[in-house]
Design a protein with these regions (language model features):
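Conserved catalytic cysteine-centered active-site region
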Residues: 42-47
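Thiamine diphosphate
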Residues: 1-39, 50-71
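Conformationally flexible catalytic loops at phosphate/diphosphate-handling active centers
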Residues: 75-107
Length: 107
């Protein structure tokens, strides 16, 4: 209900959901994307929201910037979905300089 309210109020909001491992009897054997349907359809009435999902650990930073850009530009909540593999993964990645970051100001 809160996300649907944010859609109707046109609040730019970034919701980050790190999905946990699947069902198991101890240590999960695989990750799940169980929150995808909830993110897509889990609101009352017609309140569609964009969903951004990174594919690599290094892509998470760019995906977060893109989700923030969409939220600010279109004044809507945006879901940023990730999973356990990405949350615990690592790879070489260069932190960009401040001047290299995109301008997120709304004009």
């Amino acid at each position: 209900e809160t996300i649907g309210l944010a859609v109707s109020l046109e609040l730019p909001l970034l919701v980050v959901a790190i999905q946990r491992g699947g069902p198991s009897t101890g240590l999960p054997t695989k990750t799940e994307q169980a929150d995808l349907l909830q993110a897509m359809f889990g609101r009352n009435g017609e309140a569609p929201v964009p969903i951004v999902a990174p594919c690599t650990p290094a892509d998470c930073f760019d995906a977060a910037l893109e989700a923030a850009r969409i939220a600010l530009t279109y004044r809507t909540p945006v879901f940023l979905l990730s999973d356990g593999y990405l949350a615990n993964g690592s790879e070489p990645w260069r932190i960009p300089e401040t001047e290299e970051l995109p301008d997120l100001r709304v004009r």
